[in-house]
Amino acid sequence: MMPFIERFPELGARETRSVTAIHRQDLPDGEYGFLELYCNEPGCDCRRVMIDVLRPETGWSKIWATISYGWESLDFYRKWGGTGSDPIEIKGPYPDSLNPQTKYSDALLNLFCFLIQSPDYVERLQRHYQMFRESVDREYDRSITQEINRTENRRKRLRGPKRRHEHPR
């Protein structure tokens, strides 16, 4: 997983969702940024985002919650994940137990669930996912093409007249 903002710094800075919490029982007052991370494995089609919730009060470096969210149908994740996976867990949203959480994670998950009620926000996540995936796959295709070209050039050099050895008859 890689932050969207690393591949698209200007757009990521402009479009990262943030919320200011005031007088809530379940969260300290202040700003919460919902940083998007997407899969950077070539060819992956998981259609999911991982959200790291960060705060300026902790230098935007401490992760307050990690939330996984997929916007496709359960049937999509059932097919995508195969027999050993739980499509409900893959779809989410849910606190990602393999990544950092705090005692505020459940409250931040509830806040995220409120945010994704906005079709505009979900569409933004989907658009960012598409941009990110196209960028990853383009980069991968370029690296494969470069490797093929290097291999072909090596073959040509090895077959060239200076490298060819004549065998006595």
Where are these regions (language model features)?
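Eukaryotic low-complexity, non-globular regulatory regions
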Residues: 2-8, 45-46, 73-86, 154-169
